[in-house]
C-alpha cells in the first residue's frame, strides 16, 4: 500500500496495467476504492493534499456530524462506539486514516489531476501535476461537494476594506471575542458558526438571511432527524411536504417575530433543490433569546458598510460569508459534456454519462438521508458497474 502521507507519485501505467483511478481521498473516494478492492479490482486513489480527508481537517473546530455514528460508517469498518453518537471532526479524520490502513488502500498523495480525457484506446488519460500522464480503465471523480468556496459578486465587495472571509477559513470563535460579527447565509454552516460565535464571546452576532430555511431538531426524543430522512427519501415530495408542516409546528417554535418565519416551500421540495434543512445545534435558542439577530439579505458594500436588502446599513467588525461552495469540475471534466448548467454531474453512483462511459461521480449531491450514508451506497453501485462494464480492462489484484 502506498503511504497515505507520502508525496510519491504513481508511475505511468504499463499498457497492461490499467487501474481504476479515483480522484480524491475523502470519504467518497475511499469508499469506492474499498468497494473495488473487495471485487479484486485495483484502484489507485489520487489526492492533491498531503493526507486523506483534507477537507475534513479544515472544517471548523466544533463540527460534529449531523448524522449518527452508525449510519455514517463507510463499507467494511464500523466507527468505534467511543466516538459517541455525533462524531467530532477529529474523530472523522482518525476514522478515515484507520480506514485506509484497515483495507490496505492504495493512496498516492501530492498529486493533483487537472484534466481527464478519453484515451485513444478507449481508456482514460489523466493529466496531473508534475507533467504526469496516467492511463486508467475507468475514472471515479470524488473531489467533494465543498470544493471551491463561493462568494457572491456583491457590488462594492472588491473595494470593501473591512475584515471579510469565507466560512471555509473559520476555525473557532476566539478571534471574534468582544467583536461585532455579521454571518451571511443560514445553511448548516452559517447557523452553527453563528452559535459558536455567541458561545465564544462575540459582543454581537447578526445572521443575514436571504431564503428562510427549514429548521429541524437534530434529535427528538432520541430519534435522529436522519432516520426521518432515510424513511422519506423516496416518497413523493408533495406528500412529505404536507407531512412535515404539522411536525415542524410541534417540534420547532415560531420564530417569525425574530425574523425567521416558516418557509413557504415544502421541506422535501427544498431539499431536492439542494437546500437541506438546518439541523438545530443551538440556533433556535440563540434566536429566541436575541443573542443571534436575524437581518435581511446582503445586497452589497459601500463606504465601509454592508448594505442589506431592506435598506439597512451595517458596520460590523467582521463579515463571515457562509455562502456555500462550487463543485469546481469545469476544468477537470467540463469538456466531456458530463455537467449540467450549474456545473454538477449529470449522473451519479453506478451510472456513467452517455457521452463518457467509464467515468463515474460520487459525492456531488447533498441528500436528506445523510452524505456519508449515500457515499457508501454509491461506492457499491460504482464498483458493480465497473466490474460489469470495464472489468476485463481493469488491473486485477494478486491472489
Label the predicted regions:
Residues 2-49, 53-55, 84-223, 229-399:
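Flavin (primarily FAD) cofactor-binding/catalytic cores of flavoenzymes
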Residues 59-84, 225-239:
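N-terminal glycine-rich dinucleotide-binding loop that anchors FAD/FMN and/or NAD(P) in oxidoreductases
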